[in-house]
């Protein structure tokens, strides 16, 4: 997780696309899951008077040493969702709707000593509109166990039994 530690006197904003952060950028509210691969974050702070800090740039490179690929993890999730009736097939067709569910793994997180892929669920409408469903899943990269993922009061991801 990417974390910052500051007093409440400051607001922090960040970008991940290489642009300079401003007050209109992503607000830092909770720890950010570590993106897979190479990423560049730019952070800026504003005090109560609106005075900005210098931009801090941080580069991260996360490569997981695991035989579980991202594609295999998503297939495992889809198979479980088919079993419980949430989707009808590996294309993600939702029962009774024309929309489909799509899944994406862009980051990983750690709980205790275990490392998990973080899977975000999207709903894709027939017109191509894609929106987050609010559901998150986690797959342990060492054991291949599937969990539901949620955040606690401090913004850290936690895993819960997948049912």
Predicted regions and their residues:
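...the same signal can extend to comparable exposed beta-sheet modules
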Residues: 25-27, 71, 75, 145, ...
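Exposed beta-strand-loop-beta-strand "reactive/processing" segments of non-cytosolic proteins
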Residues: 94-142
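Short, non-transmembrane alpha-helical segments in secretory-pathway proteins
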Residues: 65-108
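A short, surface-exposed interaction/processing loop segment used at functional sites
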Residues: 131-163
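Ordered hydrophobic segments in well-structured contexts
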Residues: 11-14, 42-44, 57, 108, ...
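Secondary-structure transition/turn motif
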Residues: 4-6, 121-124, 150-155
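Acidic Ser/Thr/Pro-rich low-complexity disordered segments
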Residues: 20-27, 86-94, 127-128
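Short, compositionally stereotyped local motifs that mark structural "simplifiers"
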Residues: 1-68
